[in-house]
Amino acid sequence: MPKLKEECGVFGIYNNLEASNLTYLGLHALQHRGQESAGIVTSDGVNLHNHRDMGLVSDIFSEEVLSELPGKNAIGHVRYSTTGSSQLKNMQPIVINYFRGSLAIAHNGNLTNAKSLRDELEADGAIFQ
C-alpha cells in the first residue's frame, strides 16, 4: 500500500480580536501538514497585513511579528509541496492587489486546468503579473 502524504494546511478566523494569535496556534497544530513555509494574512477591515517565510511556524512568527498583524480576520497556510518547488514564490496565503482593492486567498490543492483558465481570462482582458 502506498504511503499517504499530507497536503498543506489551511486555517481561518473570523471576527476575533486575537485573529493573528489564534491563526498562529492553528497553524502550529497543522504543522505536520507542511514544514516548507508558512504565512498569515490579517484584515483590519481596511488593509491586509501579511507575513510569510520559509520554515516552521514557530521560527517564522515571533510575538513581535504577530503584533504587526492587526485585525479581526485572518487566514493562514502551511505548505507541503506536492507540485512546484519549495520557493518563496510558492508561499501562501497569496495577496492580490487589483482595481477594487486587495484580496488574500489560501488553498490546498492543484488546479489541473490552470492553463486553460488563464487563457480564457486573458482572452477576456485579464492581466497577470
PLM regions with names:
Residues 121-129:
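Conserved glycine-bearing catalytic or ligand-binding loops at nucleotide- and phosphate-handling centers
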Residues 1-115, 120:
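N-terminal glutamine amidotransferase
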